[in-house]
Amino acid sequence: MKKAILGKKLGMTQIFNENGKVIPVTVIEAGPCTVIQKKTVEKDGYEAIQVAFGDIREKLRNKPVKGHFAKAGVSVKRHIKEFKLEDSNSLEIGQEIKADVFEAGERVDISGVSKGKGFQGTIRRWNAHRGPMTHGSKFHRAVGSMGASSDPSRTFKNKRMPGHMGNVNTTVLNLEVVRIIPEKNLILIKGGVPGPNKGLVQIRNTVKA
């Protein structure tokens, strides 16, 4: 991984490119993220950096976390995340990673926690077909067959059934960075990204490049 940053999803809008074409974009407040720890092979067995993002009142953090930030000489933040970067040696504790680490036209992968949908049936959760609605049909949106009878005498694991939908870690690959607004720490991404407005997202260079 070459570049990575934490951000907050602000919402969606649309912009016009130089040809007058409308592009739907997601606006993300990316950073500034502060480096609070460097992991090394000698001490930790691997190389990585730990970054913090988002303001929070100090009294809402416990003493161990406050001490972790105090050791780095950084004010207490809301989110902490670790990234394995190729050039982690070039970053120092206390250094800020800002939105301009990316450029317009780059491809990125964005991870976040998807919106929770609560308990849903198989039609919405798994795009299952419904049953007949007329001619004496006894099932319409029900699950239908869940498996065979005497053999195997059970329902197989991972059978697609009703249950909780959403609220899971989700990654969307190969999204385009349309525009960077560095003075406001904003990144405009083409299309949608996981999660609700004000939700935490991770932006990193794509693995499909």
Curated annotation (Swiss-Prot):
Ribonucleoprotein listed as a keyword: yes
Region spans: Disordered: 128-163
Transmembrane regions listed in the UniProt entry: none
Matches recorded under InterPro entries: Ribosomal_uL3 (IPR000597), Ribosomal_uL3_bac/org-type (IPR019927), Ribosomal_uL3_CS (IPR019926), Transl_B-barrel_sf (IPR009000)
Keyword Ribosomal protein: yes
Top-rank lineage group of the source organism: Bacteria
One cellular-component annotation, GO: cytosolic large ribosomal subunit
Keywords: Ribonucleoprotein, Ribosomal protein, RNA-binding, rRNA-binding
Biological processes per GO annotation: translation
Annotated family: Belongs to the universal ribosomal protein uL3 family.
PANTHER family per record: 50S RIBOSOMAL PROTEIN L3, LARGE RIBOSOMAL SUBUNIT PROTEIN UL3C
Assembly notes: Part of the 50S ribosomal subunit. Forms a cluster with proteins L14 and L19.
Protein name: Large ribosomal subunit protein uL3
Organism for this UniProt entry: Clostridium botulinum (strain 657 / Type Ba4)
